[in-house]
């Protein structure tokens, strides 16, 4: 797909929803292990690339070649899309190359015409992109060579034209932006990628708001309030893990 066909491309605005807000539901690698009944999840780059390529279309010609199969799925215009509370999916570890948990949310996504197969394809795509997270350090020739892996030229062009020297994890953001435009947004959903630095910023904002809500003024009272906040958020307070934030529009 030629980047010139996408005239409305712009760098996605930062997410305005704080991932530490009380109405946000959190999903971690431990939830994935519980759902799959597995103690160990294979998160190697080989597995990520294999699934990412398998879920793409190569038998047809034209603009659909190399794109996820879900993109050819027609949107149901008459469907009534039910809003749902934001879902925050934590990366499997503090190393983003290990990807994100593969968990489907039928009570929310099915009502937006997003099947388990669609969601699985998306996570596999993101995880494949996570395997290439070091691409930001590559030269232009190496980036363009990624097309040989079956990656859409759309994503590579998006990186070259929109993210060079402007954002971290450009390939991951390019993949997610492609899915948002081609699949999620028409189905009244949107996914944000929030890196660990952005998580740390949101955490600081959340702690400050909590301190202000408690009416703290002195250093000692602020310290106690911060400790209370950490205790309340102990399972999700890590700033080392990146996040995917899934919201309804």
Curated annotation (Swiss-Prot):
It is found in: Cytoplasm; Nucleus. The keyword Heme does not apply. Keywords: Cytoplasm, Nucleus. The keyword Endoplasmic reticulum does not apply. It comes from the Eukaryota. Pfam families: DUF4646 (PF15496). InterPro entries: DUF4646. GO terms for cellular component: cell division site; cell tip; cytosol; nucleus. This is Uncharacterized protein C1198.03c. It comes from Schizosaccharomyces pombe (strain 972 / ATCC 24843) (Fission yeast).
